[in-house]
Design a protein with these regions (language model features):
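N-terminal helicase ATP-binding lobe
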Residues: 1-199
Length: 199
């Protein structure tokens, strides 16, 4: 285990992070249900939860990365105009490779880019670009797409929000174009309702 992964592991099991996350969930729920933002984070809590999210976004595992994304999502409604939030959201969403959310969460990414983040963003936007499209895969989507390219048979599942149909569309386009349509493609879906998504 690397030093960074041990730091991520410590953060995931830190009771203080769990306490901050529960407070953010309550804050978000009150804001959503009652339209009142009556639960405040003190400056230390705000700084700490952003630092936790930054550490977790550097994880190679899904649990840490998901928790970082959750923290940014919970903070968004209350802090979206805050410069510090913009800086951390830019960094975290870039590390997660979530460029669709980045364009929504951060108004002007160039204003909050550091050299490290600008370079990472450029590399990911170049390498993880969807073939024959201007969109960019998220990190897990890109890993799956690359695995599909190197496999003769492949089976996978993922949550609704993962973008399975999006990946399959890109992969089928890749096969038709790059392999000149010489491969056969069979897509099995579990229900009739999903047939429309892959046709």
């Amino acid at each position: 285990m690397t030093w960074l992964e041990s730091l991520v592991n410590r953060a995931l099991h830190d009771p203080y992070l769990n306490e901050l996350t529960r407070k953010l969930e309550r804050k978000y729920a009150y804001n959503f249900l009652y339209r009142e933002d009556s639960i405040d984070l003190c400056e230390k809590e705000y700084d700490d939860v952003l630092r936790f999210a930054d550490i977790l976004s550097r994880s190679s595992g899904a649990e840490g990365r998901n928790k970082a994304y959750k923290i940014i999502s919970l903070l968004y409604d209350s802090y979206k105009d805050d410069k510090q939030f913009q800086y951390y959201a830019n960094s975290i969403l870039t590390k997660l490779g979530n460029f669709a959310s980045l364009s929504l969460a951060v108004k002007n990414t160039e204003a909050v880019d550091t050299l490290e983040i600008a370079l990472e963003k450029e590399v990911k936007m170049t390498y993880q670009k969807v073939p024959f499209n201007d969109l960019v895969f998220t990190d897990p989507q890109y890993q799956l797409f690359e695995a599909l390219k190197d496999s003769n048979h492949f089976s996978f599942s993922g949550p609704t929000s993962f973008g399975k149909s999006f990946i399959m569309d890109a992969f089928i386009q890749y096969i038709i174009t790059e392999r000149h349509g010489i491969d056969n493609i069979v897509v099995l879906v579990p229900t009739r309702a999903l047939i429309n998504q892959v046709t």
